[in-house]
């Protein structure tokens, strides 16, 4: 059975991608920071081989925790994302740093952390 790791899996594109793969027999490692939406996603997918991770990937420690918890996927969908709902020029340095890590640094850390395993498998895709 093929395995997909999907970040941002509790809504939007990530949720729809997870739904499509689940319907086509894939097992899923689903990551979301929103507990309520994670619960809804958990109830939406069938299969005993699915895993759910309630993690905020804007935090470096949580990316490391995820890397230590998942097996090598056949497919990585690095989809997690948020936006800042402030007017231009009103976001704090903390908000920008968190957003930057989630959308850029964390994605790089996740991919770099998986690369050795992905190379060994030779059939994995990002």
What are these regions (language model features)?
Residues 10-11:
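Conserved glycine-rich cofactor-binding loop
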Residues 87-100:
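Substrate-binding pocket helix/loop in short-chain dehydrogenase/reductase
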Residues 24-40:
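Conserved glycine-rich Rossmann-like NAD(P)H-binding loop of the short-chain dehydrogenase/reductase
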Residues 80-85:
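Conserved NAD(P)H cofactor-binding loop of Rossmann-fold oxidoreductase domains
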Residues 45-59:
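Rossmann-fold cofactor-recognition segment
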Residues 111-112:
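A short, exposed helix-loop element centered on a Lys and neighboring polar residues
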Residues 2, 73, 118-126:
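Active-site loop of short-chain dehydrogenase/reductase
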């Amino acid at each position: 059975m093929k395995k997909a790791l999907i970040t941002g899996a509790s809504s939007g594109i990530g949720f729809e991608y997870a739904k499509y793969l689940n319907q086509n027999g894939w097992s899923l490692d689903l990551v979301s920071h929103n507990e309520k939406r994670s619960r809804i996603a958990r109830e939406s997918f069938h299969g005993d081989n699915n895993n759910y991770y309630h993690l905020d990937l804007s935090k470096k420690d949580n990316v490391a925790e995820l890397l230590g918890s998942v097996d090598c996927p056949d497919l990585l969908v690095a989809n997690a994302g948020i936006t800042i709902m402030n007017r231009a020029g009103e976001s704090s340095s903390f908000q920008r740093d968190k957003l930057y890590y989630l959308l850029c640094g964390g994605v790089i850390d996740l991919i770099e952390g998986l690369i050795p395993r992905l190379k060994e498998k030779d059939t994995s895709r990002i």
